[in-house]
């Protein structure tokens, strides 16, 4: 039987750059009901940047009545207003949120809607068409801002908690609508329920890259670890040519509007998986784990990290190995 190595299995796609996007300060914090002190949020974000994270979602400009945890977003944005160490983004639900982001000096926003009608209604109480109309308003609001970035997260791009498997035709239709409005955006396909398999992720991420979209459109993947597939699915997306991968330190959070979809993929788990890959994440594991420990200590925080359970002495020894 001929011998093979990892490179024979995964091919040259293993050697393109990887960009880790940290979403715990937004996607994670919003899953905690009790208010987290603003000072603690800022210190955690600072710790993540110090650990080497260079892209972070630091919160959302949403109604404090809808998401009370984000009521202090103006204070957090004010603290990081002039910070050039990392790309900092915020989620916005509408043009007003985009305007607030601009007012507070942020240069990157994230807009989310679901491919699935049922999930979009459950999540934001709008039809998909209404959400696309909202995206048009957001794009209009930022149209005169130079060097302003927008990312669109397509929730339920693989599976819907209410309707089951989402057909690729629905994903393609959503992408076409998005790129018509924002040809230079980054589009993230989100495994909202965490039920996608690595094979499904790889197939779909390859398929979207074959679509006739503007060359300025780029791709990302946002997975959940609900079924234990978080790292495997992120790697499948990477092997399909996707270099931008979302994670949350300590595996904090999930989708509050997708029943059972707990657990973002833990940043530390994915960073460990990239050891010896030939693609550096630039993240210091020791520093990252300290921040993950602090996140896990937040009252009512539901975390899902594997690496945090490994004895630190054993982890340090492994990190020293070539």
Please tell me what each predicted stretch does.
Residues 2-322:
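Catalytic cores and adjacent flexible loops of soluble metabolic enzymes
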């Amino acid at each position: 039987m001929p011998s093979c190595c990892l490179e024979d299995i995964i091919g040259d796609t293993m050697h393109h750059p990887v960009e880790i996007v940290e979403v715990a300060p937004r996607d994670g914090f919003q899953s905690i009901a009790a208010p987290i002190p603003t000072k603690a949020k800022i210190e955690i974000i600072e710790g993540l940047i110090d650990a080497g994270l260079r892209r972070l979602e630091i919160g959302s400009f949403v109604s404090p009545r809808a998401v009370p945890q984000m009521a202090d977003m103006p204070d957090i944005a004010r603290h990081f207003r002039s910070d050039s160490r990392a790309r900092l983004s915020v989620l916005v639900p509408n043009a007003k949120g985009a305007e607030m982001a601009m007012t507070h000096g942020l240069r990157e926003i994230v807009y989310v809607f679901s491919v699935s009608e049922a999930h979009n209604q459950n999540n934001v109480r709008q039809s998909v068409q209404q959400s696309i109309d909202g995206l048009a308003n957001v794009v209009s609001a930022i149209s005169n801002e130079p060097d302003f970035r927008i990312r669109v997260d397509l929730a339920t791009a693989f599976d819907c908690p209410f309707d089951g498997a989402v057909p690729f035709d629905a994903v393609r239709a959503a992408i076409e609508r998005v790129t018509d409005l924002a040809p230079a955006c980054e589009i993230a396909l989100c495994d909202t329920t965490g039920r996608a398999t690595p094979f499904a992720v790889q197939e779909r991420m390859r398929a979207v890259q074959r679509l006739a979209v503007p060359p300025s459109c780029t791709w990302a993947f946002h997975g959940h670890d609900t079924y234990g597939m978080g790292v495997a699915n992120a790697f499948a997306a990477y092997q399909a040519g996707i270099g931008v991968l979302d994670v949350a330190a300590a595996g904090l959070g999930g989708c509050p509007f997708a029943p059972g979809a707990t657990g973002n993929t833990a940043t530390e788990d994915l960073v460990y998986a990239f050891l010896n890959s030939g693609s550096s994440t630039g993240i210091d594991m020791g520093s990252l784990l300290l921040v993950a420990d602090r996140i896990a200590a937040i009252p009512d925080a539901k975390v899902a990290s594997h690496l945090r359970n490994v004895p630190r002495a054993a982890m340090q020894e492994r990190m020293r190995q070539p």
